[in-house]
Amino acid sequence: NMTPGEMADRSQYVMAAWKYLQDAAAEIGNPGLRAAVLDIMKNPAPLLAEGDAKAIMAELKGQGLLAQDAKAVFPTCASTKKSPQPFYTAPGSGWNSHHIYPGGLVTHTALNVASCKALYDNYADMFGLKLDRDVVLASQLLHGLHKPWVFQWQADGTCRKEEPLAATGEHHVLSIAESLRRGLSPELCVAQACAHD
């Protein structure tokens, strides 16, 4: 039996999508933002989990953003400095959703990045609209940055079940919170949030 990592490594589609994403990140003009995005893609570690989880959980429960019976606010992780799995091995979502296979996150994200690049170009060509291309690229590249944490592969071949947080899937909130924690711009974080419902 192959591990999820071995499956992703052997998939020409996953590896092509992973290279496409790295190349897209290299197109970001702002050197600081480019370095931050590439660093996150290399190791999407949950730095935000370094906070006081009990206090965060109490605050979220108090505001009705976390179920009162929730036992934790964060998925488990052996280290806040190292992602539980590489970005390119994570699924795109959980069971009964989309891209639920090793490497699904990168194929899903590659399609979104290609689509946003085309949309950016089309608006510029048709209407002369000049958006911040760096924000467009970075927000799409990072929109699911904590799927490797949330959708960890389990020993039985399934992935961890996503829990609700703030009336949506926890990867949405945790990914945006991570960008804020890492000091990325408010414009980027808003664009990243707009990549979700």
Q: Each predicted region: which residue ranges?
A:
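Active-site flanking loop/helix segments enriched in acidic
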Residues: 48-108, 156-161
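Short acidic/histidine-centered micro-motifs embedded in hydrophobic/aromatic stretches
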Residues: 40-43, 59, 63, 139, ...
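Divalent metal-coordination and catalytic microenvironments
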Residues: 112
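Low-complexity, serine/threonine/proline-enriched polar segments
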Residues: 19, 23-27, 31-35, 39-43
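Extreme N-terminal leader/anchor segments
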Residues: 1-26
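Divalent metal-dependent catalytic cores for phosphoryl transfer on phosphate-bearing substrates
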Residues: 93, 103, 107, 121-197
